[in-house]
């Protein structure tokens, strides 16, 4: 999923987790016992889509195209041979899974499946691996220094990143419940983008009132049974990381770019005011 790397996430990671050496690169297996009842492979959701639930988009991000080749089977994934991670077209790892020059320690290339439906298929979005996240930070200008980030820190950062996205989707589903009648199949995610320094009007108003600015912002575009809807997500520092890898306070709401979104915001504001 998103490759946005926020400085607060790296600096506040202090949770007690299994050592990163216990979470090594694993390759996909040909038959996962947990998923054999649905499909051969590990793990892919193969339920047919409902043709009445909106149109699909054909624009698939490059890092999602072959993502399921790197989703680890929870039971048998660790037993697979590393050679299965190679791209059969050139017998090389995909570029975004390649260790960076002078990288101080190895990182896992295993990717975790999210609970977020992809609008272009019957599959779910897949989160980046530790190696992909490291490479993304380097592309954004970050440089590793001694004792800056450890192997264990990268393990924790990925868990925090994934948990943030799962929580954001849960908040979106709460808003989308207002439209359950018109879209009974539920929403799916089309695309998303980071806008860390493009503060939303709501965030700026809060700042003028004395509150801190968010350390990150994402815009998520969802498919509501054929209608594109944009959500704004502001990320605020919530303090110490807990055992569930949560430290971020999320402010999730539909963007005020349609009459439907304005009406939703007004209804929810009224309910909160009168409850």
Curated annotation (Swiss-Prot):
Lineage: superkingdom: Eukaryota
Primary localization: mitochondrion
Coiled-coil zones: none
Record-level Gene Ontology MF annotations: holocytochrome-c synthase activity; metal ion binding
Positions of region (Disordered): 1-59, 83-102
Function description: Lyase that catalyzes the covalent linking of the heme group to the cytochrome C apoprotein to produce the mature functional cytochrome.
UniProt key word NAD: no
GO CC, alphabetical: mitochondrial inner membrane; mitochondrion
Protein name: Holocytochrome c-type synthase
PROSITE patterns hit by this protein: CYTO_HEME_LYASE_1, CYTO_HEME_LYASE_2
Alphabetically ordered keywords of this record: Heme, Iron, Lipoprotein, Lyase, Membrane, Metal-binding, Mitochondrion, Mitochondrion inner membrane, Myristate, Repeat
Compositional bias segments (type: Polar residues): 9-28, 48-59
HRM repeat ranges, renumbered to this chain: 31-36, 41-46
Species this protein is from: Bos taurus (Bovine)
Pfam families reported in the protein's UniProt record: Cyto_heme_lyase
Residues with lipid group (N-myristoyl glycine): 2
InterPro entries xrefs: Holocyt_c/c1_synthase
Keyword Oxidoreductase carried by entry: no
């Amino acid at each position: 999923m998103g490759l946005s790397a926020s400085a607060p996430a790296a600096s506040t990671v202090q949770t007690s987790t299994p050592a990163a050496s216990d979470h090594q690169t694993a390759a996909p297996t040909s038959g996962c016992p947990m998923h054999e009842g649905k499909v051969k492979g590990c793990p892919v959701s193969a339920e047919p889509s409902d043709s009445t639930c909106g149109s699909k988009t054909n624009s698939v991000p490059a890092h999602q195209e072959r993502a399921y080749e790197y989703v680890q089977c929870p039971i048998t994934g660790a037993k697979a041979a590393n050679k299965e991670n190679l791209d059969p077209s050139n017998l090389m790892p995909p570029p975004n899974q390649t260790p960076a020059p002078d990288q101080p320690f190895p990182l896992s290339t295993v990717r975790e499946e999210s609970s977020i439906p992809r609008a272009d298929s019957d599959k779910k979005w897949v989160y980046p691996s530790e190696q992909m996240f490291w490479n993304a930070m380097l592309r954004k200008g970050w440089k590793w220094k001694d004792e800056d980030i450890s192997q264990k820190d990268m393990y924790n950062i990925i868990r925090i990143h994934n948990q943030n996205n799962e929580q954001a989707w849960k908040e979106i589903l709460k808003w989308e419940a207002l439209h359950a009648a018109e879209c009974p199949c539920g929403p799916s995610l089309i695309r998303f983008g980071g806008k860390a320094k493009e503060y939303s009007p709501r965030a700026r108003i809060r700042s003028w009132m004395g509150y801190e600015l968010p350390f990150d912002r994402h815009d998520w575009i969802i498919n509501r049974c054929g209608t594109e809807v944009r959500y704004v997500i502001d990320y605020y520092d919530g303090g110490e990381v807990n055992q569930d890898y949560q430290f971020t306070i999320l402010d999730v709401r539909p963007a005020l770019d349609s009459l439907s979104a304005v009406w939703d915001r007004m209804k929810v504001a009224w309910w909160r005011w009168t409850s």
